[in-house]
Amino acid sequence: MFSSQINLGSVRDIDDSVFVRQASIGNPDLKPSTSSNQNFGLIFQKDSYKFSIDYWEVDYDDRIEVESAQALLTQDPFGPSITRNEFGDLIGVTTTYFNEENTKISGTDFQFDYIFELNNYSPISLRVKGTIFDEFLTPQITADGLSKMINRVGKFNYDSHTHSLPKKRLNAFMDWEHNGYLLSLITRYVDGYTNERPITGLGASLGYKNKVDSFLVFDISARKSIDLDEGNINFGIAIINALDESAPRLYDAPDFSFDTRVHDPRGRLVNLNLEYNF
């Protein structure tokens, strides 16, 4: 972790929101991270059904993490990583990598598979996969100077050295293959989460709130394979986010935008594909 880079980024200062220089530098004093893991699982299968569930825990010591410019500024607006001019205006924040003393993560993964048998046609396959985050505990220094473990699940986490952590994610896949055609439907769901960043009067007047809504999108696709004397041709069309759902709004002043780590803002996308194999 010795590389360094500089870019512009938005942060919320004491009484203003600004774009400033954010430098990220290496840390030669990093220690290797270690962890202990536990998993408990169950698999049930009968005929066309299959269900699996897995509970997991990971306990990290010295997990390597990169500092958040906003978290540094929130914790100490005049700290050693903060650069200001002679008038006190914020002009830069310097971040680096560090060893987080302790991190505890736990959650549950599950998967369900089912084959629908159709009398005179090919079967339809269904698969549902999901993850539920229970805990993502990281230390935080309280107002009295003590370290306290905070659960980051279900939060935007603008003020900590981590990122958004929706509690639930769910994906469902349905496929039907018949006479050389493959038809697919994919459903993607991301749970909503809270945003504890204070919202200004302007932001509230524009409809922003302290919750990022859940996000549900559907993707559909069709594919046709044609065999030739030498090789085959595959035609495909896919409509991503078929209902043209907009990314949930996120108040992250000075940005009035979306969560770049979680949501795709591009709306409906149409992809065409032609492939020749020989």
Model-derived features with residue positions:
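Membrane-embedded beta-strand positions of outer-membrane beta-barrel proteins
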Residues: 40-42, 51-53, 112, 126-130, ...
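Extracellular loop and loop/strand-boundary signature of outer-membrane beta-barrel proteins
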Residues: 25-28, 94-99, 154-161, 204-210, ...
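Gram-negative outer-membrane beta-barrel transporters
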Residues: 56-197
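Outer-membrane beta-barrel signature, preferentially recognizing the C-terminal barrel domain
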Residues: 1-52, 58-59, 85-108, 113-118, ...
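C-terminal beta-signal and adjacent terminal beta-strands/loops
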Residues: 60-61, 134, 187-201, 224-278
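Outer-membrane beta-barrel proteins
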Residues: 46-48, 59, 113-119, 124-126, ...
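Generic long, charged, amphipathic alpha-helical segments
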Residues: 187, 196-217, 221
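Flexible, surface-exposed loop regions and adjacent strand-edge segments
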Residues: 1-8, 67-77, 142-151, 199-205, ...
